[in-house]
Amino acid sequence: SLYTYLLTAFVLLLHRNARQQEYIVGMPIAARLTKEQEHMIAPLVNVLPLRLPLDEAASFSELVQTIRGILFAAFRHQRLEFTDIVRAVNVDRSAGHFPIYQCMFQLDNMPLASPTLNGVN
């Protein structure tokens, strides 16, 4: 999907600057998991940390396939609350940054409304 390709490109951009072998990127997902929540007017969002390895010897296509598998696994666990993940990992907390990831990747796929101006098409 477009998201997978763009996330792969984002990780490569991170790698260009940081030169790490692994990145943890936050992925916001809609947390409307029940019928009752679908009609609520509220931002129901959960953030899943994605542990994304980067193999410098891999081709772009191979990286896309690796990240695709990680995304499918993340969606299977989307009911996990972020606070539960933080407790399970037991990382040191700091007011200066999020406990598990320091960057997020989000793709808005909502169609944009075209502005309407008098006399302009």
Spans of model-derived segments:
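Adenylate-forming
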Residues: S1-N121
